[in-house]
Amino acid sequence: MSKNKDQRTAKTLERTWDTLNHLLFISSCLYKLNLKSVAQITLSILAMIISTSLIIVAIIFIASANHKITSTTTIIQDATNQIKNTTPTYLTQNPQLGISPSNPSDITSLITTILDSTTPGVKSTLQSTTVGTKNTTTTQAQPNKPTTKQRQNKPPSKPNNDFHFEVFNFVPCSICSNNPTCWAICKRIPNKKPGKRTTTKPTKKPTPKTTKKGPKPQTTKSKEAPTTKPTEEPTINTTKTNIITTLLTSNTTRNPELTSQMETFHSTSSEGNPSPSQVSITSEYPSQPSSPPNTPR
């Protein structure tokens, strides 16, 4: 019933909280409008009432939460007190034992007797830890953990027999006179001394050295540039003689004086090569006497 009441009150408080918030928002919006003085006064009064009611609702929320917390703490305290007041279960299960919880030494002695009766030949030391409370004392018996140590392997004991002979590595037969057991054990010394063993060391095979031949340098012969000899210019003697003969044949009929000059010029052409300019001058000016050709010095 109490849970249902708490849920109802919580729901009502939430609803009132929401409605009051909405009313505050509406009143603030209306207050911003330019209304008459009476309306503004009423809105301000409503806002004050709503704000105070919101504060009251918040206080109720906090008080209800604190009440729930205190109720849970009281329940926990009651449970712990009940646990402390109750006696241990392992004492109440067997009423025939007649154990009084005030004597922990009697409890440990009885536990050891029970263990000895159930498992004979086994003795385990128990560590009794007494936990003291206000009215009762409980003992918790913890057996010792078995120590795991590696046992050393002992050599087997030799039987104490009188007729036990130890065979040595080497017994010379010269010691044995008439003892048959000695003759059975002894060893004869060889006359020849064992020669030294010849140890042959393995000869290492010579590794053939491979010499890598380097690439031969390629010698490229530089090709000589072809030397072109200057060609001698052909002599113009033949051309000059042909020109002179044509001029003579053409002008013999016209001027007899010019023929004599050309003959003299032809005779001197063998000694010195006249220039073509001189030939053209003589042909253009036939009346003037031709100058003698310049002889080379």
UniProtKB/Swiss-Prot annotation:
- Which segments show compositional bias classed as Polar residues? 254-288
Q: Where is this site: Cleavage?
A: A65, N66
For bias type Basic residues, the affected ranges are 191-215
Give disulfide pairs as residue numbers: C173-C186, C176-C182
Q: Does the keyword Transmembrane helix apply?
A: yes
Q: Report TM segments.
A: 38-66
Q: Which residues lie on this side of the membrane: Cytoplasmic?
A: 1-37
Extracellular-facing ranges: 67-297
| Keyword Secreted included in the entry's annotation | yes
Q: Which UniProt keywords apply?
A: Disulfide bond, Glycoprotein, Host cell membrane, Host membrane, Host-virus interaction, Membrane, Secreted, Transmembrane, Transmembrane helix, Viral attachment to host cell, Viral immunoevasion, Virion, Virus entry into host cell
A GO biological-process term: virion attachment to host cell
Location of region: Binding to host heparan sulfate: 187-198
User: InterPro entries given for it?
Assistant: G_prot
| Biased composition annotated in UniProt, kind: Basic and acidic residues | 221-232
**Its GO CC terms?**
extracellular region; host cell plasma membrane; membrane; virion membrane
* Disordered, as annotated region: 124-161, 191-297
> Where on this protein are sugars attached?
70, 72, 80, 86-87, 92, 100, 105, 113, 117, 119, 135, 137-139, 147, 199, 203, 219, 231, 235, 237, 251, 253, 269-270, 275, 282-283, 287, 290
Family under the similarity heading: Belongs to the pneumoviruses glycoprotein G family.
State what protein this is by name: Major surface glycoprotein G
